[in-house]
Amino acid sequence: MTNIRKTHPLMKIINNAFVDLPTPSNISSWWNFGSLLGLCLITQILTGLFLAMHYTPDTTTAFSSVTHICRDVNYGWVIRYLHANGASMFFICLYAHVGRGLYYGSYVFQETWNIGVILLFTVMATAFVGYVLPWGQMSFWGATVITNLMSAIPYIGTTLVEWVWGGFSVDKATLTRFFAFHFILPFIILALAMVHLLFLHETGSNNPLGIPSDMDKIPFHPYYTIKDILGALLLISALLTLTLFAPDLLGDPDNYTPANPLSTPAHIKPEWYFLFAYAILRSIPNKLGGVMALLLSILVLMLIPMLHTSKQRSMMFRPFSQFLFWVLVADLLTLTWIGGQPVEHPYMTLGQLASTLYFLLILVLMPLTSLIENKLLKW
């Protein structure tokens, strides 16, 4: 008798994706982040659902409803901080996942990669609208500053901004629609993640060597399920430690002050995971130029498959490319630090240098280095 998991229409799909999936035998822990992102998404949807049961998307009561969740709802503070810090964990896993793809040449699977970039954009949009919901000072001013960037679009900019706001400033209508977006987007992310997996399973996973592994595959279960469970336990431990010992470590104290349109905070800055893009935005003195650079900082990822000039897929045996990759990581960390600093002399210049280096590395230096490495292979 054939096993039900191989014949049942629904079970068959799950079986082919998570049980009998042929997987390369040599994939490292860097391949854990895909499943960790799935775990993060489920955690965020569940905690978010419980928060939505008590939250009111109205300018007069939003802030106090969040306070009510923390003070009066049973374990509401745990749910709220799991959700807030879960977002940080989500982005740590996202950036590690993208970094893994860059290092090992996973971007050669173009459909999977491009859907991944769209997913990154969608998660960033979700995090942004979600940050507005507590209606603190940084929520309000962050929403004002970022939505205002659309006014840089020639001719239709101002109309577009007012259309997004639902009025002439960030107000009741803006908060209500942002709550609606924040509720619907995670389900769109869930659907996109399934398409991401669908395309990945068409080709099979890449591996650290960047070579075909069809002759050496092992079933996903039990080998990688157990490995993923270890990763999941580490992620949950980190999230719980952060939530229970330092829940406000990554947040902004300004968001504990209710939104006040008449008082601008001294330093408007987004959450830590957007600081690198914020630094790139600020490094260009022109408004439209800044917006273009901001978009390109993520969109440039879509160009990477076309900029792959190496004869080898992975960076494992390409020391010069490895060096540039780690320079890129250091550059992004520098941009993250600068994004959180005030707009003053040394930081502005450093930000401009780091932003230039970011685009230079991806668009020029890395493809050129790959060509040089190709030549060195012949020597």
From Swiss-Prot:
- Where is it found, in Gene Ontology cellular component terms? mitochondrial inner membrane; respiratory chain complex III
Give the record's membrane topology: Multi-pass membrane protein
Q: Where in the cell is it found?
A: Mitochondrion inner membrane
Going by the UniProt record, its keywords in alphabetical order are: Electron transport, Heme, Iron, Membrane, Metal-binding, Mitochondrion, Mitochondrion inner membrane, Respiratory chain, Transmembrane, Transmembrane helix, Transport, Ubiquinone
Give the matching InterPro entries: Cyt_b/b6_C, Cyt_b/b6_C_sf, Cyt_b/b6_N, Cytb/b6-like_sf, Cytochrome_b, Cytochrome_b_C_euk/bac, Cytochrome_b_N_euk/bac, Di-haem_cyt_TM
Return one Gene Ontology term, BP aspect.
mitochondrial electron transport, ubiquinol to cytochrome c
User: Is Heme one of the keywords?
Assistant: yes
* Protein role: Component of the ubiquinol-cytochrome c reductase complex (complex III or cytochrome b-c1 complex) that is part of the mitochondrial respiratory chain. The b-c1 complex mediates electron transfer from ubiquinol to cytochrome c. Contributes to the generation of a proton gradient across the mitochondrial membrane that is then used for ATP synthesis.
Q: What is this protein called?
A: Cytochrome b
Organism of derivation: Kogia sima
